[in-house]
């Protein structure tokens, strides 16, 4: 086990393309860190830099108190699990797991002990003589994890290991990976574009965008207090409703609050914090009139999509986040919902409201 520390890490490719733009964070001994962000944000590049598969243009990467910038991948005491499993098709499960240990000259009894212990932990003991083509996707992923476990590394690195699995298997494997990490207590860094995967796995969540870190913290803290509109719209499904406010709306909603009236431009509200109501909002709370566009019933809950209405006319938002212009999502329990075309009032208490600067880059705490 080991701490992993990144200090002002940068990556610039030929032609001046800067993929990683000065990243600093630390992963504590035994912590599970998840790097999450959209495609092209730099998360996989950063993981490959930790692994030694990408060179570092500037900065330092420290693993267990040792700067590893110029150390070969094989000598960094890390083990990596890939998206495509990277198994040798002509070898049995046993030999796939043992291959790296043999190359390091480890005695046969020690190899056998490690392989069988990893197989026991992963519940693949009955598969040791099979070839990869005889395994399901989930079994292949277990073998790939087993190959990492037998090395007994200081750090596990996971590069979108569940991307090739179907939805049901992804959920099962997600739970297995978390249980395994807690059991082994090995420092882990995990890359995914799936925010639900990130939220459920992470001790520490690193949200990336455009080669920079937007926010670092506990997953629930990030969900409850996103630092920017990017984080607010990326973390959470459905995303946070983001509404561009006109100056008169800001004055009406936040009368007397100097920061809101001088800095705010975007109001955020989580879909589950909006209530369909026939009564006015509590003092300081939010009230919106919506025209229902669509209904999604997904079983235990229902999503109501509505267009904002102001003085009876639809409002087109200038900064809608990831939602269509002017659209608001309301998450309601159960299956009852208003009909499409119906006008409804939704309210939210003041403490559930989020405020951001007009450019969306800063959270404003009132």
UniProtKB/Swiss-Prot annotation:
Gene Ontology MF terms in the entry: ABC-type glycerol-3-phosphate transporter activity; ATP binding; ATP hydrolysis activity
GO CC list: ATP-binding cassette (ABC) transporter complex, substrate-binding subunit-containing
Annotated localization: Cell inner membrane
Entry keywords, A to Z: ATP-binding, Cell inner membrane, Cell membrane, Membrane, Nucleotide-binding, Sugar transport, Translocase, Transport
Superkingdom of source: Bacteria
Binding site for ATP: 37-44
Recorded topology in the membrane: Peripheral membrane protein
Domain ABC transporter: start-end pairs: 4-235
Biological process according to GO: carbohydrate transport; glycerophosphodiester transmembrane transport
Class of enzymatic activity (EC top level): translocase
InterPro entries named in the record: AAA+_ATPase, ABC_transporter-like_ATP-bd, ABC_transporter-like_CS, ABC_transpr_MalK-like, ABC_transpr_MalK/UgpC-like, Mo/tungstate-bd_C_term_dom, NA-bd_OB-fold, P-loop_NTPase
Listed Gene3D superfamilies: 2.40.50.100, Nucleic acid-binding proteins, P-loop containing nucleotide triphosphate hydrolases
SUPFAM superfamilies referenced in this protein's UniProt entry, alphabetically: MOP-like, P-loop containing nucleoside triphosphate hydrolases
Catalytic activity: sn-glycerol 3-phosphate(out) + ATP + H2O = sn-glycerol 3-phosphate(in) + ADP + phosphate + H(+)
UniProt-listed Enzyme Commission number(s): 7.6.2.10
SUBUNIT field: The complex is composed of two ATP-binding proteins (UgpC), two transmembrane proteins (UgpA and UgpE) and a solute-binding protein (UgpB).
Function: Part of the ABC transporter complex UgpBAEC involved in sn-glycerol-3-phosphate (G3P) import. Responsible for energy coupling to the transport system.
Family to which the UniProt record says this protein belongs: Belongs to the ABC transporter superfamily. sn-glycerol-3-phosphate importer (TC 3.A.1.1.3) family.
NCBIfam families: PRK11650.1
Protein name: sn-glycerol-3-phosphate import ATP-binding protein UgpC
């Amino acid at each position: 086990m080991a701490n992993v520390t990144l200090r002002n890490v940068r990556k610039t490719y030929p032609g001046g393309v800067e993929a990683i733009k000065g990243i600093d964070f630390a992963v504590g001994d035994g912590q599970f860190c998840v790097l999450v962000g959209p495609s092209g944000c730099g998360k996989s590049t950063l993981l490959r830099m930790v692994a030694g598969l990408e060179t570092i243009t500037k900065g330092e990467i420290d693993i267990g108190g040792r700067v590893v910038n110029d150390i070969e991948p094989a000598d960094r005491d890390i083990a990596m699990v890939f998206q495509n499993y990277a198994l040798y098709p002509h070898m049995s499960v046993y030999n796939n797991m043992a291959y790296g240990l043999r190359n390091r000259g480890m005695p046969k009894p020690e190899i056998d002990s490690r392989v069988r212990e990893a197989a026991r932990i992963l519940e693949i003991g009955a598969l040791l003589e099979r070839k990869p083509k005889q395994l399901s996707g989930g079994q292949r992923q277990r073998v790939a994890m087993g190959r990492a476990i037998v090395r007994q590394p200081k750090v596990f690195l996971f590069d979108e290991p569940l991307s090739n699995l179907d939805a049901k298997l992804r959920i099962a494997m997600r739970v297995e990976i978390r249980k395994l990490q807690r059991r082994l207590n090995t420092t882990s860094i995990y890359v995914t574009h799936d925010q639900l995967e990130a939220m459920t796995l992470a001790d520490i969540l690193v949200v990336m965008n455009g080669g920079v870190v937007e926010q670092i913290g506990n997953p629930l803290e990030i969900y409850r207090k996103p630092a920017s509109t990017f984080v607010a719209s990326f973390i959470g499904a459905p995303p946070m409703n983001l509404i561009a406010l006109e100056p008169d709306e800001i004055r009406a909603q936040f009368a007397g609050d100097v920061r809101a009236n001088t800095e705010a431009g975007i109001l955020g509200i989580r879909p589950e914090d909006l209530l369909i109501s026939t009564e006015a909002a509590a003092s300081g709370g939010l009230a919106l009139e919506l025209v229902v566009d669509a209904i999604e019933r997904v079983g235990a809950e229902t999503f109501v999509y509505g267009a904002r209405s102001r003085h009876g006319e639809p409002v087109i938002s200038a900064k809608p986040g990831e939602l269509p212009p002017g659209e608001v999502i309301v998450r309601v329990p159960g299956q009852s919902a208003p009909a499409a075309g119906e006008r409804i009032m939704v309210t939210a208490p003041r403490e559930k409201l989020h405020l951001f600067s007009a450019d969306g880059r800063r959270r404003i705490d009132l």
